[in-house]
C-alpha cells in the first residue's frame, strides 16, 4: 500500500502536503478548510504581534506560470492564531499544526516567541526570516550576521520545536555560509523557499500590482528550479536532524515528487492552492501516489533525497 505519510520533529502527518503560509490561512474558516482537506496539516498566516492591514491593493495577481504578490504581511495578529491553535489542539489532540510568526523588529520577534514559549502550544513554530514584501524591511536571512545573532538570542529561551522559512539563495558560497550558521542551532526544519523577491510582471504597458511600483515576490512554476536547488543544497549541508520543507512551484504530483527526491520531508502548496482551492491537495496526492506505484515506491523514505547525478 502506497503511503505519503511523513514526520517532522517526531510529529507524524498522514500526508506530506500542506499549504504555504500566506495562502488559504488568513482566517479560521480558511484554516478549517485546509484542515479538513487531504492536506496533512496547515500553517497559519504569518502572524505579527498585532493585526496588520498589509499593503494597498491590488497586491496579488495570478499570472500564466505562477503569481506575483506584495501582500505586506496582512494578518489578524498573534493572539487570533494562537488562541485558535490552543483550542484546536484540545479538540484534535492527535494532530499537529504549524504557527508562522514574524516580528516587525528584532524586539517584536522576541516578544512574540516568548509569548509562544510561555503558552501551552504544542505544535511546530515557523519563524519567517524571508518576507520580501514589506517596504523598508530587508529579508533577514540574507544578512548572515543578523541571522546568527537572532537565532542565538532565540534559542537562549525558546525550547519548543522551531524552524525557519528561508528566502531563495543563488550562490553556492551562500548555501555553505547559511548552513554553517543553521547547524549551530537546534532547528527542527528549514522551509525552502519563500517567493523570489522583487520580480516585475507587466501587462500591456503597466505593472499589475500597486505596492512598490509593481515589484513583488514571484511564486509558482517560475520558481521550481530555484526551490529544488535550495531544498537539495540544504539537504546536502544540514545536520540530519534539521529536516526540510520544500515550497515553490508545486503544481502537480510530479513537482511534489521532485521536492521529496531533493530531500524534502514535507511539501507546501501556495500559488496552486490559490488558483485551485483545497481540491488541489487531493489531485496532487493522487498524482504523487501514481508516480510512486509506477516506480515501486511504498513510502517517501524509499526515494527521499536520492536524487541521481550524472557521472
UniProtKB/Swiss-Prot annotation:
Localization of this protein = Cytoplasm
Binding of substrate: at which residues?
Answer: 45, 69-73, 128, 194-195
Q: Which cofactors is this protein said to need?
A: FMN
Q: Which reaction does it catalyse?
A: (S)-dihydroorotate + fumarate = orotate + succinate
Per its UniProt record, what Gene3D superfamilies does this chain match? Aldolase class I
Active site per database record: 131
Major location category of this protein? cytoplasm
Give the InterPro entries listed for this entry: Aldolase_TIM, DHO_dehydrogenase, DHOD_1A, Dihydroorotate_DH_1, Dihydroorotate_DH_1_2, Dihydroorotate_DH_cat, Dihydroorotate_DH_CS
Q: What positions does the entry give for FMN binding?
A: 45-46, 128, 165, 193, 220, 248-249, 270-271
Query: Record's SUPFAM superfamilies?
Result: FMN-linked oxidoreductases
Keyword annotations from UniProtKB, A to Z: Cytoplasm, Flavoprotein, FMN, Oxidoreductase, Pyrimidine biosynthesis
Gene Ontology cellular-component terms listed? cytoplasm
Q: In which pathway does it act?
A: Pyrimidine metabolism; UMP biosynthesis via de novo pathway
Cofactor binding note of this UniProt entry:
Binds 1 FMN per subunit.
Give the Gene Ontology MF terms in alphabetical order: dihydroorotate dehydrogenase (fumarate) activity
- EC code(s) of this entry: 1.3.98.1
Top-level class of the enzyme under EC nomenclature: oxidoreductase
The similarity comment for this entry is: Belongs to the dihydroorotate dehydrogenase family. Type 1 subfamily.
The record's function comment reads: Catalyzes the conversion of dihydroorotate to orotate with fumarate as the electron acceptor.
Subunit description: Homodimer.
Q: What is this protein called?
A: Probable dihydroorotate dehydrogenase A (fumarate)
Q: Which organism is it from?
A: Streptococcus pneumoniae serotype 4 (strain ATCC BAA-334 / TIGR4)
Amino acid at each position: 500500500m502506497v503511503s505519503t505519510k511523513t514526520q517532522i520533529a517526531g510529529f507524524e502527518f498522514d500526508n506530506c502536503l500542506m499549504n504555504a503560509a500566506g495562502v488559504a490561512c488568513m482566517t479560521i474558516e480558511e484554516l478549517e478548510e485546509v484542515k479538513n482537506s487531504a492536506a496533512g496539516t496547515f500553517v497559519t498566516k504569518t502572524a505579527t504581534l498585532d493585526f496588520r492591514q498589509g499593503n494597498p491593493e491590488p497586491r496579488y495577481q495570478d499570472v500564466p506560470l505562477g503569481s506575483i504578490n506584495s501582500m505586506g504581511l496582512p494578518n489578524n495578529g498573534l493572539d487570533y492564531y494562537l488562541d485558535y491553535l490552543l483550542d484546536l489542539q484540545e479538540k484534535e489532540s492527535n494532530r499537529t499544526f504549524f504557527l508562522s510568526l514574524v516580528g516587525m523588529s528584532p524586539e517584536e520577534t522576541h516578544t512574540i516567541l516568548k509569548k509562544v514559549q510561555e503558552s501551552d502550544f504544542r505544535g511546530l513554530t515557523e519563524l519567517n526570516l524571508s518576507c520580501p514584501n514589506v517596504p523598508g524591511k530587508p529579508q533577514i536571512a540574507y544578512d548572515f550576521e543578523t541571522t546568527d545573532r537572532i537565532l542565538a538570542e532565540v534559542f537562549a529561551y525558546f525550547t519548543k520545536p522551531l524552524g525557519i522559512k528561508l528566502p531563495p539563495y543563488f550562490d553556492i558560497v551562500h548555501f555553505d555560509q547559511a548552513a554553517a550558521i543553521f547547524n549551530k542551532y537546534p532547528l527542527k526544519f528549514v522551509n525552502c523557499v519563500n517567493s523570489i523577491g522583487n520580480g516585475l510582471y507587466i501587462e500591456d504597458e503597466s505593472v499589475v500590482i500597486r505596492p512598490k511600483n509593481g515589484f513583488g515576490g514571484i511564486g509558482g512554476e517560475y520558481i521550481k528550479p530555484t526551490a529544488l536547488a535550495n531544498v537539495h543544497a540544504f539537504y546536502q549541508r544540514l545536520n540530519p536532524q534539521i529536516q526540510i520543507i520544500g515550497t515553490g512551484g508545486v503544481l502537480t504530483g510530479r513537482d511534489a515528487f521532485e521536492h521529496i527526491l531533493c530531500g524534502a520531508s514535507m511539501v507546501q502548496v501556495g500559488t496552486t492552492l490559490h488558483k485551485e482551492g483545497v481540491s488541489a491537495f487531493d489531485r496532487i496526492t493522487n498524482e504523487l501516489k501514481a508516480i510512486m506505484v509506477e516506480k515501486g515506491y511504498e513510502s517517501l523514505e524509499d526515494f527521499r533525497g536520492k536524487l541521481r547525478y550524472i557521472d
